[in-house]
């Protein structure tokens, strides 16, 4: 049994919620009507120049997703993209038990051939297109050169905790990994090597992917 005051309070709340939902629908309809108008204009106005990434940091990841999430666009300065990727890999190549985590996303399009993504610990690299072929990256690699002091050591048995998905890789790709990793929905235009010069490696997950030339499992179990 509810007293009259409680019933009135519930009704008031319901009316307020209905108004909020109605307001939200109006905003959605307005946005849908406004979006086509945003695409209008001359061909010259629709062209996108190379962007300085420093103006995009706040917009794309610092405020929305946190400082360790990067969303790149084909219109970004290739040099800055490459420098950012290199800096992340320098931190994460041997960061086996570190606390840092990185998510690197590429918007659909074809990226400059100077951009190479090396994937270290606790790093996810992904394309944001509907299909893997919507996002074309020249090169992506995961090598096994960090374990022990000998640079000729190619043991990938500790290359854990990383992944790549939903993109097209336009050259030969090395993905020398072990457990707790994934490669899925990837188109490799060249050959795919699942080892680093036949060094030890064991595990990994590969699915829904296509290789144009060959997939060399090598020493991979």
Regions found by a protein language model. Name each.
Residues 1-17:
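Short, Lys/Arg-enriched N-terminal segments with co-localized hydrophobic residues
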Residues 19-27:
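Bacterial N-terminal signal peptides that target proteins for export
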Residues 37-39:
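C-terminal motif of bacterial Sec signal peptides marking the signal peptidase cleavage site
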Residues 49-83:
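Right-handed parallel beta-helix/beta-solenoid
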Residues 52-57, 64-65, 183, 188, ...:
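Predominantly polar beta-repeat domains that present long G/T/S/D/N-rich surfaces used to bind, process
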Residues 70, 74-124, 130-133, 140-142:
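N-terminal extracellular ligand-recognition/capping segment immediately after the signal peptide
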Residues 107, 126-131, 138, 165-170, ...:
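Feature marks extracellular polysaccharide-active and adherence modules
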Residues 126, 150-172, 179-188:
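Parallel beta-helix/beta-solenoid
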